[in-house]
Amino acid sequence: MLDKYRSRLLLFLRKYGDQRLTHKALRWLRDLPLGREHLGTAIAVAVHNKQLVGIIAVGKYGVDEAIIAVKPTARNKGVAKQLVSFIVNRLGRMYARVAVDNTASLNLCFSMNMVAFDMFTGVTGKPTLWLGAGDWRREEIEGIINK
């Protein structure tokens, strides 16, 4: 099913990701193999009136990637919260990396009771927070933090 919609999902993310989604994250989704389940990996979409209004994609609970985008006309209506909630409920936990100047995403994460547990310099050179939701464990990403 992913192959049928992959190009549309990527186009949506490029268009509505407000230029905050990394090329690495988009390549991850583009290259995500089909045919078998990947532990901690899920994609969910939000649809309103038969129109795609939001996407979330998480790889390895967010340790590999966690990307979300919502169409501007659907923002501040709970779409992003529903998508994050779906992923946390389905996977049991979720991690995200958010640059400290991305106030919209930080507001979303903190409104979902995500916990900031580490800060590092992200790929854009900006201070970036690691956040966890649900049954998150710092040890799960310890090797990444200490690199």
What residues fall within each predicted segment?
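Conserved acetyl-CoA-binding loop-helix of GNAT-fold acetyltransferases
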Residues: 70, 75-89, 103, 107, ...
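Conserved active-site alpha-helix within GNAT-family acetyltransferase domains
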Residues: 100-126
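C-terminal "cap" of GNAT-fold acetyltransferases
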Residues: 122-147
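Acetyl-CoA-dependent GNAT
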Residues: 8-67, 73
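Extended, folded domain segments that form the structural surfaces/walls around functional sites
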Residues: 67-68, 96
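A short, well-structured alpha-helix characteristic of acyl/acetyltransferase catalytic modules
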Residues: 1-19, 140-147
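Conserved GNAT acetyl-CoA-binding A-motif
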Residues: 89-101
